[in-house]
Structure formats: structure tokens, C-alpha cells
UniProtKB/Swiss-Prot annotation:
GO terms for cellular component: cytoplasm. Belongs to the EF-Ts family. The gene is tsf. This is Elongation factor Ts. Residues 82-85 are annotated as: Involved in Mg(2+) ion dislocation from EF-Tu. Associates with the EF-Tu.GDP complex and induces the exchange of GDP to GTP. It remains bound to the aminoacyl-tRNA.EF-Tu.GTP complex up to the GTP hydrolysis stage on the ribosome. It is found in: Cytoplasm. Transmembrane segments: none annotated. Pfam families: EF_TS. GO terms for molecular function: translation elongation factor activity. Keywords: Cytoplasm, Elongation factor, Protein biosynthesis. It comes from the Bacteria. The keyword Disulfide bond does not apply.
Length: 288
């Protein structure tokens, strides 16, 4: 068996980020061949990934990346098994690298991201293989759960990540004055994170959801002994309150409860003499 030096072990650890004892074992198993040792560790990571495939990976973080010109952005959720790992530099650095890669390649799905290659500084593997390697390194199941890419050629993208990175939101505003509208976009991203709307306006709320809510309100009213002739009016009133909870434009603005988001947008349009419209948003909360 070849003599394994401390320097060889350190070099392998620096290259892979895997613990010293595992690196020593890999070098011993491969006769001190650095390339074979790296491959050995990758295979070990893949085996561990397969072993932990059924484990529950409900911890992790929300990662958002927005381009310097605010014309594109991406939000993703990367999961692991424990909060301890989720807060570590290795995991957060890996999530950030995935976010950078997804933004750079304008990646629109997790499947597409898994087929891309990591930067050389992150090992140069395909993302799918890098996740298996990361599983071996951290000893936990690592799972790329979801991803959404924004293209805002007609305006700007802005985002907000709550401290702890368990909640994040990203929003696309169409506007002809993106620089002036940027502070409002930031506020609205925070609004989406805090108030959890499901759609931009009430016309986008799915009809099946409206029907479900209406039936619940109807049965509640009848159960409270309300007369049949008044029930429809009661249902409409409660639907209005429902819209104020789940529709972004009808919510109270996070920085002024006296104004709806729609009124804030109208005010900005007049003040800036600019077109400003919310096109879409995505809100991710860890584990949803």
C-alpha cells in the first residue's frame, strides 16, 4: 500500500471539502491516486444519497438571485434534513452557487438546472452529481425542491428574503421608469412575503377556489340561521373580505394600512408620470 502523507489528505480535503478521515480512507483505498480518490468519494456520496433518498428533507433555505440590471431573477428552494446543516457555510454556499448558475443560464426548471455543470470552483460536476457529492459531504439528503425564473425585459425584478432564509418573495413589475420604481418594487416584494397573497388581482383567482369559498360562506350563513333571501348578499360581502386577504392589489399596503396596494400604485403612476403594473410574483416558504 502506498504511503499516504498528511499533505495528500489535506489536498484532497481542500479539493472536496470532505472530512479528513474520509479523505484518508479514500486515498488508502485507491493507492494514493488523487483522481481515483475523488471518484471514490463521489461514488460514496452517490451511495449515501441513494441510502438517504427516503429521508425527510424539510429543512433548508430559500435562495434568490437578481441580475445587476434587475431584468431577470430566480428563486429556488434547497432542502436538507436538519437546521444545523441548513445554517452552515457549506450548504448556504452551495445554495448560492445554484442560484448564480440558474440566473446565469436563465434556467426555468429544476430538471434543467440538474443538467447544468457547476463552476470549477464548486467541483465542475453536473448539478445532479454535485447534489450527491454534497450529500456525501454533509451526511444528509440534499434536495433541489423547486425553482422559478423571472424575465422582466419590460420592467424590473425585485426580491426580499426574510432573515433566516426560510421565507422569500420575488416580484416582476412592468414599468417605463424602473430606477424610480425600484423602491416600490422592494416594498411590494416584502408585502408578498409578509401578507402571502395568492394572485395579483381578483380576476386571476381560480373559479374553483371562489366556488369553494362561496359554498363555505353559504353554509356558515345558513348554519347561523340567516334567511335564504339574505344569504347571497352575505356571501358576496365575505368574498370581498376574502379578496382583501389573498389578492395583492386589494391588500392593505404593508407601509400604510390606510391605503390598498392598488391605491399606492395609482399614486406612483401620477407622481412619476410612469406606467407601473404588477405582472407576477412568487412566494416560497420553506417546507410548503
Amino acid at each position: 500500500m502506498s504511503q499516504i502523507s498528511a499533505k495528500d489528505v489535506k489536498d484532497l480535503r481542500d479539493t472536496t471539502g470532505i472530512g479528513m478521515m474520509d479523505c484518508k480512507k479514500a486515498l488508502e483505498e485507491t493507492g494514493g491516486d488523487m483522481e481515483k480518490a475523488i471518484e471514490y468519494l463521489r461514488k460514496k456520496g452517490a451511495a449515501l444519497a441513494a441510502k438517504r433518498a427516503e429521508k425527510d428533507a424539510s429543512e433548508g433555505m430559500i435562495c434568490i438571485r437578481v441580475s445587476a440590471d434587475r431584468k431577470s431573477g430566480v428563486i429556488l428552494e434547497l432542502n436538507c434534513e436538519t437546521d444545523f446543516v441548513a445554517r452552515g457555510e457549506v450548504f448556504t454556499g452551495f445554495a448560492g452557487a445554484l442560484g448564480d448558475l440558474a440566473l446565469e443560464n436563465r434556467t426555468v426548471s429544476t430538471d434543467a438546472l440538474l443538467k447544468l455543470r457547476m463552476a470549477d470552483a464548486m467541483g465542475g460536476e453536473l448539478v445532479d452529481d454535485a447534489i450527491k457529492t454534497m450529500t456525501g459531504k454533509l451526511g444528509e439528503k440534499i434536495d433541489l425542491k423547486r425553482l422559478f425564473f423571472f424575465d422582466a425585459a419590460d420592467g424590473l425584478v425585485e426580491s426580499y428574503v426574510h432573515p433566516g432564509a426560510q421565507l422569500g418573495a420575488i416580484i416582476h413589475l412592468a414599468t417605463d421608469k424602473p430606477e424610480a420604481v425600484a423602491p416600490l418594487a422592494k416594498d411590494l416584494a416584502m408585502q408578498v412575503a409578509a401578507a402571502a397573497p395568492i394572485e395579483v388581482d381578483r380576476s386571476a383567482v381560480p373559479q374553483e377556489l371562489i366556488a369553494k369559498e362561496s359554498e363555505i360562506y353559504r353554509q356558515q350563513a345558513l348554519g347561523q340561521g340567516k334567511k335564504e333571501e339574505f344569504v347571497d348578499k352575505i356571501v358576496l360581502g365575505r368574498l370581498d373580505k376574502y379578496y382583501q386577504e389573498v389578492v395583492l392589489l386589494e391588500q392593505s399596503f404593508i407601509k400604510s394600512n390606510n391605503m390598498k396596494v392598488s391605491a399606492v400604485l395609482d399614486e406612483f403612476r401620477k407622481l412619476l408620470q410612469a406606467a407601473v403594473d404588477v405582472k407576477e410574483f412568487v412566494r416560497y416558504q420553506l417546507g410548503e
